[in-house]
C-alpha cells in the first residue's frame, strides 16, 4: 500500500487504461476519492458494479472540479473539447495528465485550457491487451 498522494482523482475516460488506474488507486490508495467520467451509461454502470469509483458522472467538468489529479484517458479526438470543458474548473495546484499515445496533439489541444497554477504533465503509460473497457 502506498502513501495517499491525492485526496481526489478524476479519471476522464474509464476504458482499459482508465479502469486500470482506478483499480490501482482503489487497491493502493485507500481514502482517495476516485471520480470516473464516461459518456456511456453502461460504462458507468460497469464502474459502479465493479466498485472502481466513488463518484460517477457524464460531465468532465463535474469530474475535474476539486480534483488534485485529473487523468484524461479518452480518444485523442476528444481532448480539445474536454480541455475546453475542464479548464475553468481545474483547481490551483492540480496536476493534469493524460494517457494519449502521441504528444504533439495533446499539447496543442490541452495547453490553451491550462491556466497558471495548474501543472500539465503529458504522459503515456504502456499497457494494454486486445480488449477494451473496464
What are these model-predicted stretches?
Residues 2-59, 64-65:
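NAD(P)+-binding Rossmann beta1-loop-alpha1 motif at the extreme N-terminus of oxidoreductases
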Residues 31-32, 90-94, 116-118:
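A short helix->loop->beta-strand "cap" motif at the edges of active sites that frequently abuts
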Amino acid at each position: 500500500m502506498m502513501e495517499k498522494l491525492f485526496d481526489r482523482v478524476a479519471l476522464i475516460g474509464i476504458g482499459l487504461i482508465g479502469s486500470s488506474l482506478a483499480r490501482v488507486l482503489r487497491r493502493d490508495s485507500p481514502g482517495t476519492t476516485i471520480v470516473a467520467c464516461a459518456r456511456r451509461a453502461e460504462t458507468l454502470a460497469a464502474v459502479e458494479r465493479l466498485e472502481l469509483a466513488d463518484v460517477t458522472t457524464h460531465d468532465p467538468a463535474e469530474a475535474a472540479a476539486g480534483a488534485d489529479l485529473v487523468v484524461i484517458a479518452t480518444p485523442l479526438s476528444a481532448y480539445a473539447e474536454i480541455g475546453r470543458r475542464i479548464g475553468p474548473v481545474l483547481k490551483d495546484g492540480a496536476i493534469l495528465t493524460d494517457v494519449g499515445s502521441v504528444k504533439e496533439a495533446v499539447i496543442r489541444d490541452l495547453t490553451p485550457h491550462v491556466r497558471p497554477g495548474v501543472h500539465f504533465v503529458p504522459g503515456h503509460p504502456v499497457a494494454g491487451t486486445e480488449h477494451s473497457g473496464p
